[in-house]
């Protein structure tokens, strides 16, 4: 890179005609490539564009690192000045990408670094009860669909407290979102001590797996 700094601005075109930078390649799925952080640091030092989006899509390297749960790469990107709240990801901001794809480690990292939590479903998925309460009490009130989607996301994140809050606001215990063929009980079923309590609570309130609902 020292001998050929112009490589930092290289764009690679895929079969669909979309172009991506070497920073995107370093952050691409599944992430966690050997020396990923060091490679990104080297590219930034050589002048790589932090905010350059994939041509035609607008996703920045931080969006891709978020979707891959690659905290090592994200740390270098954020330290270099990457926009924590860049729009136009496959789901939205880097944080929204992380939450939507269930990448909890990097979601927490982004919140800790100051990413905005300005969506009901993001607060629910991350178990941010006080932030969720603000959304639930502000005007205009969230719609039924927004309540249901946030409830599903709370279960996605294994967050029993925010799930209960949304259930008390009328969430459908068996809501099936358009973007995932799983009920709240299905998506909550990756067991750990926190999720086990959530799964038990869902069952106590009549939640069913999708196989039962299809019968």
Which stretches of residues belong to each language-model region?
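N-terminal segments that cap or nucleate solenoid repeat domains
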Residues: 1-22, 126-146, 150, 162
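Start-of-repeat signature of ankyrin repeats
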Residues: 15, 19, 57-58, 91, ...
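Ankyrin repeat domain, specifically the short helix-to-loop turn at the C-terminus of the second helix
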Residues: 1-7, 39-49, 75-83, 109-115, ...
């Amino acid at each position: 890179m020292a001998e050929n700094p112009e490589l930092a601005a290289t764009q690679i075109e895929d079969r669909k005609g979309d172009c991506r930078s070497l920073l995107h390649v370093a952050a691409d799925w599944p992430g966690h490539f050997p020396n990923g952080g060091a490679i990104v640091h080297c590219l930034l030092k050589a002048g790589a564009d932090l905010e350059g989006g994939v041509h035609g899509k607008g996703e920045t390297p931080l969006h891709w690192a978020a979707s891959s749960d690659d905290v090592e790469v994200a740390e270098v990107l954020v330290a270099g000045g990457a926009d924590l709240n860049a729009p136009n990801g496959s789901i939205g901001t880097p944080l929204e990408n992380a939450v939507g794809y269930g990448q909890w480690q990097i979601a927490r990292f982004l919140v800790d670094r100051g990413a905005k939590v300005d969506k009901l479903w993001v607060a629910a998925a991350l178990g941010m009860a006080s932030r969720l309460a603000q959304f639930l009490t502000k005007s205009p009130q969230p719609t039924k669909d927004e309540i249901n989607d946030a409830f599903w996301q709370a279960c996605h994140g294994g967050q029993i407290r925010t799930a209960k809050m949304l259930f008390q606001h009328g969430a459908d215990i068996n809501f099936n979102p358009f973007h995932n063929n799983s009920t709240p009980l299905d998506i909550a079923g990756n067991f750990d001590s926190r999720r086990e309590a959530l799964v038990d609570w869902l069952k106590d309130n009549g939640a069913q797996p999708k196989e039962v609902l299809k019968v």
